[in-house]
């Protein structure tokens, strides 16, 4: 039997450490029909996904995938950016396909207000978090309560790149 080299052990520990650390990344809030909430840097009202790092250390998102297609987990990939411990990151789902570190991020797809499944995948191909959104009304978000860890509920007061509100609703009804 061959000896395991210290180099191999170091690589294995780094891989395990990165996998464990990256599992603290969650989808925290989604808006799939933004008509008046907040504008992107072009002045457009675009749908968005907010992710949160629930961990105690920063996570580098380089080559992580974000997708609305279960068959294509790397439909859009993050540039070489990190998200700090307890921090939020807003990704516009605009079909503009912008992935430049230090600039607003835009996926190469838009979200469906009819509902869909959104997945974030680590560079190693591990599914970190998946959420299936229901049909969504305009300017309503679907987010976690308690923030970052709980079940998904609807919010009238959306909170892009910030902690979710404290008044959630179990369903969103169309105006009469």
Predicted regions: what is each one?
Residues 16-17:
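N-terminal signal peptide c-region/cleavage motif recognized by signal peptidases
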Residues 20-176:
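Intrinsically disordered, low-complexity linkers and terminal tails enriched in Ser/Thr/Pro/Gly
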């Amino acid at each position: 039997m061959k000896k395991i080299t210290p180099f191999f052990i170091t690589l294995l520990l780094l891989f395990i450490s990165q996998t464990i650390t990256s599992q603290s990344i969650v989808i925290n809030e989604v808006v799939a029909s933004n008509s008046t909430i907040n504008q992107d840097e072009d002045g457009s009202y675009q749908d968005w996904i907010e992710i949160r790092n629930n961990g105690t250390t920063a996570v580098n998102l380089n080559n992580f995938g974000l997708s609305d297609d279960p068959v294509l987990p790397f439909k859009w990939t993050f540039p070489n950016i990190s998200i700090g411990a307890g921090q939020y990151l807003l990704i516009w789902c605009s079909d503009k396909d912008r992935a430049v570190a230090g600039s607003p991020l835009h996926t190469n797809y838009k979200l469906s207000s009819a509902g869909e499944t959104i997945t974030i995948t680590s560079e190693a191909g591990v599914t970190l978090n998946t959420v299936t959104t229901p049909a969504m009304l305009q300017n309503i978000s679907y987010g976690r309560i308690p923030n970052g860890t709980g079940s998904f509920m609807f919010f009238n007061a959306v909170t892009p790149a910030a902690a979710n509100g404290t008044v959630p609703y179990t369903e969103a009804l169309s105006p009469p």
